[in-house]
């Protein structure tokens, strides 16, 4: 409590100083400890060279010192921070500085579901506290628009198309690294508990065995950040710890693992299209319960409709190696298809510029 109170006092004094210097205050808040560092690097790049009319402050709940402009403050104390002009987050918050304009930046590139259907209405109601939702493309805007209207919510935040900030940053910063030799296959999962009908978690051991025994590729397991401490992950590490071709990647930035991977295997993680656009390499979706797509009314989403444009779908672990070989024969074809698909994102490569333009329009 004392630490939060101290942060409130210091922040309000800093804001007074900035206001005396005619600065507009941007406050970016990281509400989830486990996801803070995976977003930190590209968010800093986005905000640090804002025009001289803005001053940027960051808030977080991680129990370590992150940096000069970062302040530890529990979400409940945000209501005591005064005179913030623009409050921004890329995970949902429920408490805000009073009087601020509130912006949510969605952190996936495609129109994959954000939460299961049974949690969607509550999520939509939480979003009503925001003034704006920034999205990567018109397809995302269409999905979010339909999501609010599904629950008869007529008045919802202003939906803005800005492109995808993270991919733009990674392509700009790591263009040479992304050209390195591909000697791996990466398995990237969605949150185990998030979509239980689709999760790959119960098949991971068999998939890893299959890849190690039937291919010459190294195998990288990259769990969702919220599952890093999950018992299933640590059981897998224990099982495969003596195999030099296996590694588990807990890093905050996936670029190293993605750069050296020829194929990504996933269930329904939004990272599927991120990987494809970033590397121009194919994706294999492992979905043994494919019927759940139609049951949940996901069959009209581009995320599922366009799977064949970036890769293929497997429903049985025993068919994984066979499918990998088929996909490898069409690497050039997938590369061209992925490049065409990326052009559907209007501000691809221009997200940072578009973000700043939208910010400048807010009074």
Regions found by a protein language model. Name each.
Residues 1-33, 38:
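Membrane-proximal basic amphipathic "stem/tether" segments
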Residues 23-171:
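Active-site and donor-binding regions of nucleotide-sugar-utilizing enzymes
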Residues 36-46, 165-236, 312-314, 346-347, ...:
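Conserved catalytic-core segment of nucleotide-activated headgroup transferases in glycan assembly
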Residues 55-70, 212-249:
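Catalytic donor nucleotide-activated moiety binding site of glycosyltransferases and closely related
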Residues 73-82, 227-273:
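Donor nucleotide-activated moiety binding/catalytic core segment of transferases
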Residues 92-106, 113, 250-296:
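A donor-sugar binding/catalytic signature common to diverse glycosyltransferases
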Residues 155-156, 270-343:
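Catalytic binding pocket for nucleotide-activated donors in carbohydrate/polymer assembly enzymes
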Residues 347-363:
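C-terminal alpha-helical cap of glycosyltransferases
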């Amino acid at each position: 409590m004392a630490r939060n109170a101290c942060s409130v006092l210091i922040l309000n004094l800093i804001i007074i100083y900035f206001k005396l210097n005619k600065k507009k205050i941007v406050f970016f808040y990281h509400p989830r400890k486990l996801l803070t560092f995976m977003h930190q690097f590209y968010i800093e790049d986005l905000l640090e060279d804002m025009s001289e009319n803005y001053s940027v402050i960051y808030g977080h709940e991680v129990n370590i010192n992150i940096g000069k402009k970062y302040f530890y403050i529990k979400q409940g104390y945000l209501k005591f921070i005064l005179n913030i002009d623009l409050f921004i987050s890329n995970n949902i918050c429920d408490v805000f500085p009073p009087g601020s304009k509130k912006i949510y930046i969605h952190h996936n590139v495609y129109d994959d579901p954000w939460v299961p259907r049974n949690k969607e209405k509550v999520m939509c109601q939480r979003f009503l506290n925001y003034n704006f939702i920034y999205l990567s493309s018109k397809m995302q805007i269409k999905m979010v628009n339909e999501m609010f209207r599904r629950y008869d919510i007529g008045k919802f935040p202003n939906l803005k198309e800005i492109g995808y900030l993270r991919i733009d940053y990674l392509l700009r910063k790591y263009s040479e690294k992304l050209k390195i030799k591909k000697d791996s296959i990466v398995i990237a999962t969605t949150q185990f508990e998030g979509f239980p009908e689709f999760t790959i978690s119960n098949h991971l051991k068999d998939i890893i065995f299959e890849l190690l025994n039937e291919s010459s590729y190294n195998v990288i397991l990259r769990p969702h950040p919220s599952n890093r401490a999950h018992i299933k992950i640590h059981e897998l590490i224990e099982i495969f710890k003596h195999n030099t071709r296996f590694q588990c990647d807990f890093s905050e930035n996936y670029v190293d693992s993605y750069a050296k991977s020829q194929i990504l295997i996933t269930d329904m993680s939004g990272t599927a299209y991120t990987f494809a656009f970033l590397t121009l390499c194919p994706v294999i979706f492992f979905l043994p319960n494919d019927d759940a797509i139609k049951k949940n009314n996901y069959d009209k989403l581009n995320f599922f409709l366009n799977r064949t444009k970036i890769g293929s779908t497997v429903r049985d672990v025993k068919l994984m190696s066979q499918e990998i070989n088929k996909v490898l024969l069409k690497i050039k074809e997938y590369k061209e298809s992925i490049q065409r698909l990326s052009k559907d994102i209007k501000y691809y490569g221009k997200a940072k510029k578009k973000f700043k333009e939208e910010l400048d329009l807010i009074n």
